[in-house]
């Protein structure tokens, strides 16, 4: 390196041209409109995937978030996949974790082999959930008309400026029959009558410390019985909630604070629609209510695997029952 090059690297203009200094009192919390945009409440109707050709349908809030898209939250992107019978699609993302839930239909997954690992092949049907680590794009081939919910952590990698090139967990399949059997066991447990949550967490033995479905993603299949009004809870992870099944009369109440009785003050109401989705921003109190006359089912997907590793999940419950 010559002297002029050294001078250019150590020059005042290069090292200090972009620096800024702020009064801490005015800059301590940049999460506000115009700076780091807050994550908004948002809901998507099942009409989004009810008709049309085979397509990937992103639930994109990147414009509101002020980040590259598609992104549903700063770290996660959710999509509906609509596949016509006999057709296929290749969902592609630079992501370490991809989660798929089969809302309806049936088909097959094929993914080519990678060095050190064999090709992947899986037959899937309604109610199944499967996760894939980093690797080649999978081909999803529909046997019957199908709707899948797909969530991945691509926006996080975009922000970090990195490529996913190493699998961090084993591809896994959670068949609907096994999930349903666990839910029925939960319902039959006498202690469930006193519980705030009738849900099963999906996990893997390779992630025993976090008890999550991947190292970044968290998934829970939950039941909300008729007549239930769940005490509020909150957490610092974002929730991308899929309404698996419900009748009118199911809803979620969301708000910033609790009153002296442990109820959400000035709550906003999100009415559920079967096959729809909504986002629960981090840090907000929320609780699910079922006044429909029938059991409802919910699948929240969160970035709680990452938050658990960072020790920043901070989950809290308004009452003593969990």
Locate the predicted segments by residue:
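Conserved metal-binding segment of the jelly-roll/cupin
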Residues: 84, 103, 121-144, 151-154, ...
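Short, low-complexity cationic-aromatic patches
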Residues: 12, 69-73, 86-100, 136-144, ...
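A structural feature that tracks compact, well-ordered secondary-structure segments
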Residues: 78-81, 108, 151-152, 219-222, ...
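Double-stranded beta-helix
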Residues: 2-5, 143-189, 291-322
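A short beta-strand-loop-beta hairpin characteristic of the jelly-roll/cupin
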Residues: 84, 88-126, 243-274
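Conserved short histidine dyad/triad with adjacent acidic residue
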Residues: 56-67, 76-94, 218-238, 284
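A short, N-terminal "cap"/entry segment at the start of jelly-roll beta-barrel domains
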Residues: 1-73, 161-221, 231, 322
């Amino acid at each position: 390196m010559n002297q002029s090059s050294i001078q250019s690297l150590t020059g005042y203009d290069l090292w200090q041209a972009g620096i800024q200094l702020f009064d801490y009192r005015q800059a301590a919390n940049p999460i506000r409109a115009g700076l780091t945009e807050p994550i908004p409440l948002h809901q998507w109707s099942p009409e989004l995937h009810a008709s049309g050709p085979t397509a990937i349908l992103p639930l994109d809030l990147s414009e509101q978030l002020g980040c590259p898209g598609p992104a549903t939250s700063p770290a996660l992107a959710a999509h509906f996949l609509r596949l016509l019978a006999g057709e296929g699609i290749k969902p592609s993302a630079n992501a370490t974790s991809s989660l798929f839930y089969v809302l309806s239909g049936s088909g097959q997954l094929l993914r080519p082999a990678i060095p050190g690992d064999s090709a992947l092949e899986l037959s899937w049907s309604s109610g199944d959930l499967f996760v894939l680590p980093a690797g080649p794009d999978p081909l999803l081939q529909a046997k019957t008309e199908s709707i899948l919910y797909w969530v991945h952590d691509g926006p996080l990698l975009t922000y970090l400026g990195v490529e996913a090139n190493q699998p961090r967990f084993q591809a896994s399949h959670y068949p609907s029959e096994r999930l349903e059997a666990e839910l029925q066991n939960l319902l039959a447990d006498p202690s469930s009558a006193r519980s705030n949550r009738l849900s099963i967490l999906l996990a893997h033995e390779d992630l025993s410390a976090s008890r999550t479905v991947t190292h970044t993603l968290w998934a829970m299949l939950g039941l909300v019985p008729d007549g239930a009004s769940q005490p509020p809870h909150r957490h610092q992870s974002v929730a991308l909630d899929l309404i698996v099944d419900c009748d009118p009369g199911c809803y979620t109440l969301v708000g910033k604070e609790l009153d002296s009785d442990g109820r959400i003050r000035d709550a906003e109401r999100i009415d559920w629609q079967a096959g729809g989705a909504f986002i629960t921003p981090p840090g907000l109190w929320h609780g699910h209510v079922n006044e429909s006359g029938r059991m409802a089912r919910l699948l929240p997907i969160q970035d709680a695997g990452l938050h658990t590793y960072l020790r920043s999940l901070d989950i809290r419950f308004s009452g003593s029952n969990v």
